[in-house]
Curated annotation (Swiss-Prot):
Belongs to the Mediator complex subunit 13 family. This is Mediator of RNA polymerase II transcription subunit 13. The gene is SSN2. GO terms for cellular component: mediator complex. InterPro entries: Med13_C, Mediator_complx_sub13, Mediator_Med13_N, MID_MedPIWI. Residues 666-685 have a biased composition (Acidic residues).
Length: 1375
């Protein structure tokens, strides 16, 4: 297929998608199978209405899209690989701005500045391939990889864009899933730990797959092996993409993705700091703060002096404390008289809690052996042979680092300063070396055995939290022995119903594990609890082959070890654990006591040191949320009864093992427990970790699940399956490699919506109120001279950056296409389309059109011509003057006045309550009043209404600094109060003024700094308007009320926390004219045939007279001959979300204009277009003349929209219309870069010999500034003042050129879609360049540095009307 065959393609098939929004609806069905993700359009040859049955062998639309997609993919790969850019979608890239130093200063704010680069591929019918790039700078993007840890925690659930396909997602977590699984595995059985290991392997496999997938697309992201380089995101609405695999889910799932490929909108600053509320001083003038700081020097010196003295006193106190003080006789450390001290009495073997009584030094009882060392941590009951009672309790609270503990606290061991740990072995007992008292044979585990919790205190990670007490033991000591016997009897009973048994087990109150058990079992269970998990995986044979290494010297022996050696140990039962497994690091065996010791404990448990907790009237289930009253409270009750009705019997074994794992294997019947363990398989690991957390199900200890003895396929398998949920499934982590197809680039819209505002808590607005608020918001933005959307920050931050940001992309493309030629402006204009010659029968005989008298030669189509700036009409000395736009800057010196009559207003200002902000607003309102009066716009007065609103300043007082919702609610209440006040006192306010009040202007200060907050401000003004329109109840006043006008003032124009804000006079004058334009006309229009949308602006464009007046007889003569062939411009734009459409009407001079917003959420575009067209006809019927109507849309025009407009405008009307439908593209595929030629030697010599005031021979304007329209001859001895460029004051940044291209641009958002327009052209404005940025002041700067380019595509031309019906049928053209 040749490129020339695309010159006249066949009828393009209709768009398969119904119209929703051109910004959100792709023009073609997406298919992410190809490299560019849905760039290839499927062939739809058979869907054409009226097409011939014989199909062409090749579809030019498909061929064009395939070729353009391939070229775009190639360029994209190398831009990512060589330039380090990140592809946001198939042709849009984001990159970091490189810091550059210019004129001795480094540009700031570059850490937040990004480049957005778009690649455009255009294949012309002449065979020329044009690849271009356009780059914009933005501060609205922020990469997750550049965030700090503090900022990350605030961004959970925030909306982000995921590269490389710009998919919408939300941040789920910044934590590593493997760490979460590790924490979760501590509460699970060993089989679950195996699943956790599998999850870690799957996560690692997923990361490797993502790295390979990205490397094939040119990415080489650093530090992907670190956990900090990944983030867990939640991807939703996967059903919008075609299913690549049938087993992949379409619901929201979590995905691990690199942080450097995730972007979001920049964080908004704190918007409540301006309000003065309790606990916050609000705004403070930086000048006052500096003055207070200067005058407070003496006070600061006093404070510093006091701090130095206090620090010195503290150091002296610490130094005295460090000195060795004398020990009191009552101190337990007095027993340490020597290195080891004399033997002192020890009345027990277990440590006591910190609040226990330490026995004094003396002779011990005959039943208690004595040994030297620290005092035992026991409590002694008065009596000779009474054994000690251990009151140690588990520490169920979290200890902070700075918390102080007693010397006997289990958190910090008792200090051992007098002992020597140099490694020397001191033999205290000489003849007892054979009994195991050798120094090297004693290990730290011997002492940890007694320091750790006893059998009654087993740490369970998932046990319900016990109440914190300071000086009372726990509740577990109340009636333990009696309940223990009852439990032993109840556990042995068998129940016929497994559900009843499980319910009975769950309903029992939770108590310690070892209640009522003999001390022999306590020691064995404690030994099991301290065995690490790694030791369980080692066989006994391996332990025997690996003896412990040489041990270092340990502190002196414990009293319990000596007592155990001196006294014979009672016989103990054989355990299924090898001795090496139970205490691998200990040289001694565990101490086993007889049952009589427990009976003795029971005897003295109600002694003086017993703690009793009062019973509360509340239900125990409310105090202990971990215990459930009944199985009906369990969320998995249905699974226990019905879930596994179809489960096979083969699952019973696995379910039994799971149930046995979560049950306690240490019941009172120890013999049966030992036999069960011995009969188990040797491969089954022993459960030694804490009890698992099973949702809300808490399995009490010391009980066997009834399902273990009464297991059936229904009861056992359902219980096992309900507890065997995998971490991966429960957290919806998507680790399937085939899911990477969801991240393929596509042609969907990638604009980031602003979701930072919280939804209002109040009742939402209805449809009419929403449209009214939108209308108010539209009026504020369309005619704003202040920076409401914070767009000037981008211009200020990029003003000193190098103008050419396309160099790096051009170098990469040149290396990719070595034979490609660099495109210049003249070369671009010369690119033309090839039109095949039509047959002679269809073409017929062509005759050149007759030339008119005095007509010059035809202008070629590929021509660039300058467009002179229009004149502006103002009033001076009661006469209308037409001046050039630069004269507006000299409004006051020239004594200019608005072209329309003056408008008198009364002003009020709503601001956040702050004592420091009020005087600033007072000065601001005074300066604005002076500017309004100086420009002769009318009167701008402030009146006294109530005491609270002195000087027209209305404060918004917030009760508390909680959230933005509270501030918006306070603002709305203040507006309602002001509206009611104006409705009552507007007549009195009019009597106070000498002139008639045309409008009440409400200045509303915007302290939020967020564009999304503008909606809330306009909504509050709508509440004010409603309260003002209703008026006082029970009274109707026929006097017309003045209109209400809103003017939003960003807070940055008033005050700042850092520097004083001082506005220049030009800003006040521009704002005064803006307020004038917002007010309605004070008098009616003086035109002969006025339009219904008369606006009465401060100045307007000149009304040019017609070149000729046709004096001829017509059946319908025009009403106004001087206004024949008048223009009416209709422009509209659709929001990115497709919910709103804003249309604007304006005549050629701007005297009559209007802006209206429509809601597309519940209506189709055809209904909105019909309403816009009917409104247009009503406006034009007021003036029966020949109208030229231009319907323009911002952005590409879909085929359905074009067909709708053509259907509407071709209907006969009573007005003669000549219509043109066109599109305006603000970001065209072409971006111009001005070149600066080097000056020649001859011109340099001429400049040195010529005075600076003499005009030089050259071109005008200066070529060093930018583009040059044409050359001008040298100065003539008798120059014409009208032709002299220096005779007029011209703003060089406002110069504009029109370019008519010889080729056609595509009417599409996609660079791969073949959709040529009828005629294409460019509008190029010089704009602010580096040569003019410092010499010309612009109150309203351009959004981007110049040259600024706008593309215009004409799609349809025709004429309709009573006298143009035939012309419409013959001249109407549709592509």
């Amino acid at each position: 297929m040749k490129a020339s065959e695309m010159a006249r393609p066949p009828m393009r098939p209709g768009n398969p998608h119904a119209f929703a929004s051109p910004a959100t609806t792709p023009s073609r069905t997406a298919s992410p199978n190809n490299a560019q993700g849905a760039n290839v359009r499927t062939t739809q040859g058979g869907n054409q209405a009226g097409a011939s049955e014989q199909q062409q062998p090749l579809d030019c639309f498909v061929v064009y899209e395939l070729f353009a997609s391939a070229v775009t993919a190639l360029v994209s790969f190398f831009l990512v690989k060589d330039c380090g850019a990140v592809a946001l979608n198939y042709r849009t890239f984001v990159s970091k701005v490189e810091p550059q130093q210019e004129e001795g200063k480094i540009v700031t704010d570059l850490d937040r500045l990004y480049w957005l680069t778009s690649v455009h591929v255009h294949w012309f019918s002449s065979g020329t391939l044009l690849v271009s790039t356009s780059t914009e700078r933005t501060l609205a993007l922020q990469c997750l990889g550049d965030l700090s840890e503090d900022e990350q925690q605030k961004l959970v659930d925030r909306c982000i864009r995921v590269a490389p396909n710009a998919m919408l997602a939300s941040i789920s977590s910044f934590d590593d899933p493997r760490q979460l699984s590790a924490d979760d595995s501590n509460r699970r059985t060993s089989k679950k730990k195996a699943k956790m290991d599998s999850l870690e392997q799957n996560i690692e496999k997923w990361r490797m797959s993502v790295q390979r997938w990205l490397s094939r697309r040119g990415y080489s992201l650093p530090n992907l092996d670190k956990n900090s380089a990944w983030v867990t995101i939640r991807v939703g609405q996967l059903a919008q993409f075609p299913a690549m695999s049938p087993h992949l889910p379409t619901s929201a799932r979590d995905v691990l993705w690199p942080r450097s490929l995730c972007f979001m909108q920049s964080l908004v600053p704190d918007d409540l700091k301006w309000f003065e509320v309790p606990g916050s001083a609000g705004f403070r003038d930086p000048i006052d703060a500096a003055q207070d700081w200067f005058t407070g020097q003496l006070e600061r010196d006093k404070i510093l002096d006091m701090q130095r003295k206090a620090k010195k006193a503290e150091e002296d106190a610490m130094r005295r404390k460090d000195e060795a003080p004398g020990l009191y006789p009552s101190s337990p450390f007095t027993a340490r008289t020597g290195v080891y001290g004399d033997l002192q009495p020890v009345s027990g073997v277990y440590p006591t809690p910190p609040d226990g009584i330490v026995p004094g030094t003396g002779i011990s009882s005959t039943d208690t052996p004595s040994v030297s060392g620290t005092a035992s941590n026991v409590v002694l009951v008065p009596g000779g042979n009474t054994p000690a009672i251990n009151l140690s309790a588990p520490q169920d609270y979290t200890t902070t680092d700075n918390q102080q503990h007693a010397s006997t606290s289990p958190t910090f061991p008792a200090p051992l300063e007098p002992f020597q740990t140099s490694g020397e072995d001191d033999d205290l007992f000489e003849d007892m070396e054979g009994d195991g008292f050798g120094g090297p044979d004693v290990e730290e585990a011997d002492f940890d055995f007694f320091d750790g919790p006893d059998g009654d205190d087993v740490n369970m990670a998932d046990a319900p939290a016990l109440p914190e007490t300071t000086n009372k033991p726990h509740k577990q000591l109340n009636n333990d022995v009696a309940m223990a016997h009852e439990e032993e009897h109840s556990v042995k009973e068998e129940m016929s119903d497994p559900l009843a048994a499980l319910e009975s087990a769950l309903a029992a109150p939770y108590r310690p594990i070892n209640d009522g058990m003999p001390e022999e079992k306590v020691s064995e269970k404690e030994a099991k609890a301290v065995v690490p998990v790694e030791a369980l995986a080692t066989s006994p044979a391996q332990i025997k082959q690996n003896p412990p290494a040489k041990k270092e010297a340990t502190p002196p022996l414990s009293p319990s070890a000596i007592a155990k050696t001196l006294q014979p140990s009672p016989p103990k039962k054989q355990s299924s654990f090898p001795a090496s497994l139970q205490r691998t690091n200990s040289a001694f065996h565990s101490l086993d006591f007889s049952r009589r010791l427990s009976l003795v404990d029971a005897k003295y448990q109600d002694g003086r040191f017993a703690a009793r907790i009062e019973k509360t009237e509340d239900d125990e289930s409310a105090v202990n949320p971990g215990r459930l009253k009944s199985l009906k409270d369990l969320p998995l009750l249905n699974k226990l009864r019905y879930a596994v009705a179809s489960a096979s019997t083969a699952k019973s074994t696995e379910a039994l093992s799971l149930a046995r794992a979560v049950s306690d294997d240490s019941a009172s019947d120890s013999e049966s427990e030992t036999s069960d363990m011995s009969e188990g398989s040797p491969e089954d690991p022993v459960d030694t970790h804490p009890l698992p957390y099973l949702g809300r199900l808490i399995i009490p200890a010391k009980r066997k699940l009834p399902t273990e003895g009464h297991g059936t396929p229904l009861s056992v398998t359902s219980f096992a399956e309900s507890l065997a949920g995998d971490w991966q499934d429960s957290n919806s982590l998507l680790l399937d490699e085939s899911s990477l197809t969801f991240f393929e680039p596509n042609t969907w819209d990638w604009s980031i919506p602003d979701l930072s505002m919280e939804p209002p808590e109040e009742k939402p607005l209805n449809g009419k109120e929403s449209i009214a608020v939108t209308q108010i918001l539209t009026d504020q933005i369309v005619s704003a001279t202040l920076d409401l959307l914070d767009e000037n920050a981008l211009v200020e931050s990029t003003s000193s950056i190098e103008p050419s940001s396309e160099t790096r992309w051009q170098i990469c493309i040149k290396e990719l296409f070595p034979k490609a030629a660099e495109c210049t402006l003249s070369a671009l204009i010369a690119i033309h389309d090839v039109f095949p010659d039509l047959s002679a029968q269809a073409k017929g005989q062509q005759r050149p059109p007759p030339r008119k008298p005095n007509e010059s030669n035809a202008i070629p189509s590929n021509h660039m011509y300058p467009m002179n700036p229009p004149f502006i009409r103002v009033r001076r000395a009661e006469t209308h003057w037409d001046l050039l736009p630069p004269s507006i800057a000299f409004w006051e010196p020239l004594g200019l006045a608005p072209a329309s009559p003056p408008k008198n207003v009364v002003a009020f200002c709503i601001y956040p309550h702050s004592a420091s902000l009020r005087p600033i607003l007072d000065r601001f309102m005074l300066n604005l009043q002076l500017a309004y009066d100086t420009c002769k716009l009318g009167s701008h007065a402030r009146v006294e209404t109530v005491i609270e609103y002195e000087g027209g300043l209305v404060p918004v007082k917030a009760n508390s600094q909680t959230s933005a919702k509270e501030a918006f609610r306070a603002l709305k209440d203040t507006c309602i109060q002001l509206g009611k006040l104006l409705a009552i006192q507007y007549a009195q306010l009019g009597e106070q003024q000498d002139t008639k009040i045309d409008a009440f202007v409400v200045y509303m200060v915007d302290p939020f700094g967020n564009p999304a907050a503008l909606w809330e401000l306009c909504s509050a003004f709508w509440s004010l308007f409603q309260a003002y329109g209703q008026g006082p109840p029970g009274r109707s006043d026929p006097t017309p009320k003045p209109d209400l006008v809103l003017q939003i003032i960003p807070i940055k124009y008033l005050a700042s926390f850092d520097v004083p804000v001082i506005l220049d006079a030009a800003t006040y004058v521009s704002l005064a004219r803006e307020v004038y334009d917002r007010c309605p006309p004070s008098v009616a229009s003086t035109d002969k045939t006025p339009l219904s949308i008369y606006k009465a602006p401060a100045f307007q464009l000149e009304e040019s007279l017609p070149r000729n007046v046709q004096f001829k007889l017509l059946s319908e003569p025009p009403q106004d001959l001087l206004r024949e062939n008048s223009y009416m411009h209709i422009a509209y734009a659709i929001s990115l979300d497709g919910n709103w459409l804003t249309a604007a009407w304006s005549d050629s001079c701007g005297k009559s204009q209007a802006v209206v917003s429509y809601h597309l959420g519940t209506r189709v575009f055809g209904d909105i277009a019909k309403e816009i067209w009917q409104t247009t006809i009503e406006i034009l019927q007021a003036r029966r003349v020949q109208w030229r109507v231009c319907i323009a849309k911002s952005g590409p025009l879909d085929r359905e929209e074009l067909e709708t407009w053509v259907l509407l405008i071709t209907c006969p009307t009573q007005v003669n219309l000549f219509l043109t439908i066109l599109t305006v593209i603000e970001d065209p595929p072409y971006k111009f870069t001005p070149t600066t030629p080097a000056p020649s030697n001859s011109s340099a010599q001429a400049n040195t010999n010529t005075p600076g005031s003499t005009p030089q021979t050259g071109v005008s304007p200066d070529p060093t500034i930018g583009l040059t329209p044409a050359a001008t001859p040298s100065a003539d001895p008798a120059p014409d003042p009208a032709a002299d460029p220096e005779a007029r004051l011209i703003d060089v940044t406002d110069e504009t050129w029109g370019i008519i291209l010889a080729h056609r641009l595509h009417n599409s958002n996609s660079t791969n879609q073949f959709s040529p327009a009828l005629i294409s052209g460019l509008l190029v404005k010089r704009g602010i360049t580096h040569a003019t940025s410092n010499s010309i002041h612009h109150p309203i700067p351009d959004p981007l540095p110049g040259p600024i380019t706008v593309a215009v595509n004409i799609l349809w031309i025709g004429a309709v009307g009573s006298t143009w019906k035939r012309a419409a049928e013959s001249r109407g053209t549709q592509y």
